[in-house]
Amino acid sequence: MSEEQVNGVTQAVKALVLDPVTGEQVSKTELKKREKQRARELAKAKKQAEKAASAPVAAPKSSSKKEEDLDPSQYFENRSRTIMELRQTKDPNPYPHKFQVTITLPEFIAKYEGLARGETKPEVEVAVAGRVLGLRTAGNKLRFYEIHADGKKLQVMCQAQDADTVDFAAQHEHLRRGDIIGIRGYPGRSNPKGRADGELSIFARQCVLLSPCLRMLPKEHYGLKDLEIRHRQRYLDLIMNRSTRDRFVMRSRIIQYIRHFFDSRDFMEVETPMMNMIAGGATAKPFVTHHNDLDMDLYMRIAPELYLKMLVVGGLDRVYEIGRQFRNEGADLTHNPEFTSIEFYQAYADYYDLMDTTEELLSGLVKDLTGSYKVPYHPEGPEGPKWELDFSRPWRRINMIEYLEEKLNTKFPPGDQLHTPEANAFLRDLCAKHGVECAPPQTCSRLLDKLVGEFIESECINPTFIIGHPQMMSPLAKYHRSDAGLCERFEAFVATKEICNAYTELNDIFDQRARFEEQARQKAQGDDEAQIIDENFCTALEYGLPPTGGWGMGVDRLVMFLTDSNTIREVLLFPHMKPEVQAAEPTVVKE
């Protein structure tokens, strides 16, 4: 931020004034607007009070019930005012430093689930904590809370006869839905009338407010379904939707399984730079950042491939990395500019070995985490058609050129001629004939990739390997040992989407330089995604890279398939979103 921008922000902050009700710093205009609104609400409330005074007396509502009838902005203002007062009086302190939890909710449930109806253990004292998602009262001497924590829920039964040290009414006066509370009490099972089973509960001796929720939570009946809010306010999504928590628990378990798989096979996990002077290792458009001290532009990494191969040159024969990649490309249902990948490199392995490893890893992972090799998937969302993805071995294998020749009923140029101008004209005509669009630059590589996407990838529902790629599409892959012009590479597809890319690594420095030069020519033709020569990597190859297999997989897409999510935003805790329209007047919470 420039000095001029900083000064502008400073002046804007100086112009703010304190809202005595909410404790926020706001502009004078905003404060006047709020004061007028409060005056109108006060007059309205006065009229309603006068009207109510002449009406028949009805049963009183609890404070929390009355507040639930307010609109969210009124609720926030009232709740903020109450908590501001408690911060001053400390009676009670709404933000205590510590509450000693003696047992988690999962542990409590596992330990006391066997209690019989009406059985209690008043001699056992426990302390639990959680967020209140349900609250109901039965008179002045009985309250029930439903608290959630660690993916579990528990009923809190509060009876005036059990209260100790602190007055019963005082304990519960300021507790609302959404608050995080601590409960000290004893385990038991309720004994409700007219029900065969009671509910496992903690019978509270004391309830303590640990952190108030100032915002009104969505109503229990409707929940939180708005996608925009769920993705922008993931914390609220996690509070309200158990399925969201389960999805990210599954994501964590998937990564744990992958890490254990490679650790148990003597691979070493490593970390490589995320900012580089050259964007290499993949065909993609990079993000550019600037290093102020060195006064130079750097690229956010698009793949860790080149660094990992340098480590194999250095004698680390089995390495892998799980980390973030950054690609300055479009965002859609399966793409996010920032995403997680796993790459591994294994000396003395080729792409045939890697296909076996891929099947072993993913078939085993699916079986271990879901209990079956088959998982349901709805590519268009829960209301759309249902696919069954079968990860059992062996997987189908499709030879790219042979399959296209069969599908399109035409003969392709030989593999070693697919990079020529004649091949380019052939591919252009083929795309035009079949209505396949390819945006400029229409290189041979891009044209062929569009045909593959239209006629092969669209048929890959169950896990499928596509093999037989031309060298021009794979600047870092080794040439095929028996098919001229092709290379030893495969891509694995599931539900029509690529999840893995692997090949026998190119370790011939002379061939590698020639490939880089071809990529440079493509970049000169306007292909922003083409790679440029990385002299540091070439120097490493001059020391000798052993025969090596290299493999990469997108973690996010795999999580999508195993959690039945049809958009990548559902499996990213904080997905990339366009900025919201900002309010005209800035607000700053006063310390």
UniProtKB/Swiss-Prot annotation:
Gene3D superfamilies associated with the record: Bira Bifunctional Protein, Domain 2, Nucleic acid-binding proteins
Broad class of where this protein is predominantly found: cytoplasm
CDD domains associated with the record: LysRS_core, LysRS_N
One Gene Ontology cellular component annotation held by this UniProt entry: cytoplasm
Catalytic activity reported: tRNA(Lys) + L-lysine + ATP = L-lysyl-tRNA(Lys) + AMP + diphosphate
Compartments it resides in: Cytoplasm
EC number: 6.1.1.6
GO biological process: cytoplasmic translation; lysyl-tRNA aminoacylation
Biased composition (Basic and acidic residues): 27-50
Keyword annotations from UniProtKB, A to Z: Aminoacyl-tRNA synthetase, ATP-binding, Cytoplasm, Ligase, Nucleotide-binding, Protein biosynthesis
UniProt cross-references to InterPro entries, sorted A to Z: Aa-tRNA-synt_II, aa-tRNA-synth_II, aa-tRNA-synth_II/BPL/LPL, Lys-tRNA-ligase_II, Lys-tRNA-ligase_II_bac/euk, Lys-tRNA-ligase_II_N, Lys-tRNA-synth_II_C, NA-bd_OB-fold
A Pfam family that the UniProt record links to this protein: tRNA-synt_2
Span list, region Disordered: 24-79
Compositional bias ranges of the Low complexity kind: 51-62
GO terms of molecular function: ATP binding; lysine-tRNA ligase activity; tRNA binding
Record-stated family: Belongs to the class-II aminoacyl-tRNA synthetase family.
Quaternary structure and interacting proteins, as annotated: Homodimer.
Name of protein: Lysine--tRNA ligase, cytoplasmic
